[in-house]
């Protein structure tokens, strides 16, 4: 997955994806936010899987 696809999926899943990516800390990402995980070099696909795991109520079509 490319960063662009991650950002597109974030936009589909969250009303304010920029704030979510900046402020929500995920234990699934080693205690990092989405933006921090990207800066640390984590793969976008792994980050997306962490976001999905952190949000079990996410509709199946977005998983």
Please place each PLM-identified region on the residue numbering.
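C-terminal alpha-helical interaction appendages
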Residues: 1-63
């Amino acid at each position: 997955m490319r960063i662009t696809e991650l950002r597109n999926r974030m936009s589909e899943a969250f009303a304010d994806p920029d704030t979510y990516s900046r402020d929500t800390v995920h234990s699934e990402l080693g205690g990092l936010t989405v933006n921090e995980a990207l800066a640390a070099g984590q793969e976008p696909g792994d980050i997306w899987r962490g976001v999905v795991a952190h949000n079990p109520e996410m509709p199946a079509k977005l998983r």
